[in-house]
Amino acid sequence: MLGVPILVMEFAVGRASYRSLARSYEALEPRGTKWHRFKWLGLVGCYLLMMFYTVVCGWTIAYFVKAAMGTFDGTEDVAAVFGGMIGNPFELTGWMLLVAAIGFGVCALGLQKGVERVTKIMMAALFVIMIALCINSLLLPGGQAGLEFYLLPDFDKLFNNPDASFAQIVYAAMGQAMFMLSIGVGSMSIFGSYMTRDRKLTGEAANIALLDVLVAIMAGLIIFPACFAYGVSPDAGPGLVFLTLPHVFEQMPFGQLWGALFFLFVATAALSSVIAVFEAILRFAMDEWGITRKRAVMINAPLLVLLSMPCVLGYNVWADFMVPGIGDVQSLEDFVLSNNILPIGCLLFVLFCTTKRGWGWAKFIEEADRGKGVSFPAWARLWVKYGVPALILIVFVCGWLPTLQVWLAYRFAGGRLGDGGHCSPLRIPVSLAARGARTSAACPLAP
């Protein structure tokens, strides 16, 4: 409904122009229009995403190393291990630097020798690890209850949930779709520019969405049976991955092995997403300023590391920094990206591909339907032109409402926006790491 049509549009813009977002608008926009001015929004979005994603990806690598070395064996207080890691700016910086080095190092090798080859290996390894972890979890005694909890729907909680209304659940799902598919910032259009014209884009986008769902389902098959098998609450929330699961693996036979494999799976997924977005950033610089790939790496690598430091310091040195209605440094960066840049960017792609003042519907369909495969459905034109923009606006407005309510409460209570309450580091959307598997699956590096 939302993600696939926009993904098709990003692919079409990239493939028709054979350029990154830096030049794709300029190549396709009607003469006299100014769509190319919006390219900077995409670059800012990619940077914002990486400013906190590299840090979270660093956590996953750190946990893989700790699990492989047996750090969690016999550890009663996993929270102390996690707190010690994010509370140490030097350790956190080290893991972030490792992520940046791996990501830019792979991209520096080029598309075929670097990004394409490494990502193919990582994705193959990812699915092998996932299958092994799924089999292990499904064979655990007591795991059946976890399967029932995970796979049997409870519609009463959907419509009568004290924690969230049905509208809030739908809004969250739409926002999740934008984030998972990395649409709205041009990171998918760059991979569209690498596609040949022998395949129609609708089928490619649908396959990516289905793969996204498959990875999400498999992740649930790994986690929930294990939680029920060892009496762990499945609604432990953000702390589930980094605080609860190490205890679960500790109780398993060969738990050190399974724990290391699980965090290797999460780290591989997250790293493949980092590589994909790094490639979009580098191609933007190469197209916009006409510089070589090596020079683009030399400029963007230190810049991204520097801009990632506020997120690193937000968990320790700047832990007292709070924005009411939003949260800490990482939450602020996520808010600007997920609640603003992603929906606005998605709306711009839709308007560009459906309006006469933009590229236009006819040219979009012509490009999307080149080659063999599934055509973009003709009946979807009205939905894409009017329904999708309406949904995007709903996501944008609903994303701001809770924050505005808090700000208005401060205003009428005579408070100041500098005042703020405590925000636990575990408010971090740790599902980013799991989403990395889905995002990486959404990067068609080579047709």
Question: Which positions does each model-derived feature cover?
Answer:
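C-terminal membrane-solvent junction of multi-pass transporters and transport-like membrane proteins
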Residues: 37-46, 289-301, 334-392
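Juxtamembrane transmembrane-helix boundary signature
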Residues: 1-30, 226, 230-233, 351-360
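Loop-to-transmembrane helix boundary motifs in multi-pass membrane proteins
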Residues: 89-94, 211-217, 256-259, 268-271, ...
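Membrane-water interface regions at transmembrane-helix termini and the short interhelical loops
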Residues: 34-50, 83, 87, 98-122, ...
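A generic transmembrane alpha-helix motif of multi-pass inner-membrane proteins
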Residues: 93, 327-351, 373-418, 422-433
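Helix-loop-helix connectors at the membrane interface of multi-pass transporters/channels
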Residues: 57-87, 194-198, 203, 207-215, ...
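Membrane-embedded translocation segments of transport machinery
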Residues: 116, 120-271, 275, 295-296, ...
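Inter-helical loop and helix-membrane interface segments of multi-pass membrane transporters/permeases
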Residues: 21-41, 54-112, 142-171, 238-242, ...
